[in-house]
A protein has these predicted regions:
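Hydrophobic cores of alpha-helical transmembrane segments in multi-pass integral membrane proteins
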Residues: 1-23, 28-29, 34-96, 101-138
Length: 138
């Protein structure tokens, strides 16, 4: 219960800061989208790290919870990566004049999104734990 209260307090503080701060002198009010975009991008990378550590735990120690953690982190990471891609393009349109620029960072986040989708497809396709371990090794 105290963790839920702390989460609600942080959410309220973030909402207050997002709506009460002034716009940037160059970006105007479009800078406010960074309050959503940056945490989503960080969480997408964090889910990828959790999946990598879980894959190591599955391959080395063959712990069943590592396999569950690996399988559970993929949809969460895909959702946050999609949020980061959408909010990034919403920010990029007024700043760059286009929705998408083939920058290395943008392209790597898009490839990360495709990797998440591929891993989700592997997990949906193979239901036995042994075959999922093979997909982790790939």
């Amino acid at each position: 219960p105290w963790l839920a209260g702390l989460s609600a307090l942080c959410l309220l503080a973030g909402l207050y800061l997002a709506f009460s701060t002034d716009g940037d002198y160059q970006q105007g009010n479009t800078v406010r989208i960074m309050y959503v975009h940056v945490p989503a991008a960080w969480l997408s990378m964090m889910c990828y790290t959790v999946m990598a550590l879980s894959a190591i735990g599955t391959l080395v120690w063959r712990h069943p919870l590592a396999d569950v953690s690996h399988k559970s982190a993929a949809p969460i990471g895909a959702a946050f990566t999609l949020i980061a891609l959408i909010t990034g393009s919403l920010w990029g349109k007024p700043m760059w004049g286009t929705w998408w620029v083939w920058d290395a960072r943008l392209t790597s986040v898009f490839i990360l999104f495709l990797m998440y989708l591929g891993l989700i497809a592997f997990n949906k396709r193979w239901t036995t734990r042994q075959r999922r371990r093979v997909s982790v090794r790939c």
